[in-house]
């Protein structure tokens, strides 16, 4: 039994059997994380721990859901995000529901 579409990962993403089972538990069951992981180029982050174990490109979302594939994502909100420190900066705009951009990068 895989959660968040871990069963659809196959060998492409890896780490589905061990990582996703403990990371998701019952919280991500049902339609909460519909769509699964897919490949790491089309992977979507939903909630923290949902698809991060299957797709390395998704490392936990901050403050809700990420609707677009991102390279990195942290749990900090925009009010506490500092781009100068190099943390929480995504290479794509609109990575989070709450966002603040500086130097053409999205801090989430």
Swiss-Prot record:
A cellular component term, taken from the record's GO annotations: intermediate filament
Disulfide bonds: none
Region (12 X 2 AA repeats of CG): 4-84
Lineage top rank: taxon: Eukaryota
Keyword match Repeat: yes
This protein's record includes keyword Ribosomal protein: no
Record keywords, A-Z: Keratin, Repeat
Transmembrane domains' residue ranges: none
Miscellaneous section: Human have a similar number of genes as other primates despite the relative hairlessness of humans.
Function: In the hair cortex, hair keratin intermediate filaments are embedded in an interfilamentous matrix, consisting of hair keratin-associated proteins (KRTAP), which are essential for the formation of a rigid and resistant hair shaft through their extensive disulfide bond cross-linking with abundant cysteine residues of hair keratins. The matrix proteins include the high-sulfur and high-glycine-tyrosine keratins.
Family, similarity comment: Belongs to the KRTAP type 28 family.
Protein name: Small cysteine and glycine repeat-containing protein 8
Organism name: Homo sapiens (Human)
Gene that this polypeptide is encoded by: SCYGR8
